[in-house]
Amino acid sequence: MIDFTNKLKKRELPKRINPIEIYESLDRRSEAGPLRPSQKKILEEWFNKRKNERDNIIKLHTGEGKTLIGLLILQSKINETNAPCIYICPNIYLAKQAVKDAEKFGIPYCIIDQSKTIPDDFLAGRKILITHVQKLFNGKTAFGLGSKSIQVDSIILDDSQACIDAI
């Protein structure tokens, strides 16, 4: 008799950590075409030279795709570390827009819903948490304080100046 057990086992493919390769592998909507040259250049620079630096600033004009760049960088970090990553917007409106972008490009994400509990997919480093600054920085933060706080591997502040003003 033939044993097909070895053939039927799922083989885990290595996770891509290059954000450009991640983008090319995403199940994105047809209206989402290839990366723009400026996006590709920034992602190449980050991946090849700045990936291990603690603080990075990416500056682009409105509408040039900063949200997508940030989400791809966080997905790269998740694929590499399996650790929690968070995308923080200055307000709820921009957080909802970032969610739409994640859906459009097929990037796995989660949000803090009405239950106000931190999603398990975020804590386990499976999905990017998209939220707004007021969810993190308030007297009743769900992220905890001091020794009871949640450790986050990577944080992207969308429009950091506006986020800082809100804090």
Task: Set out the residue ranges of the language-model regions.
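N-terminal helicase ATP-binding lobe
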Residues: M1-I167
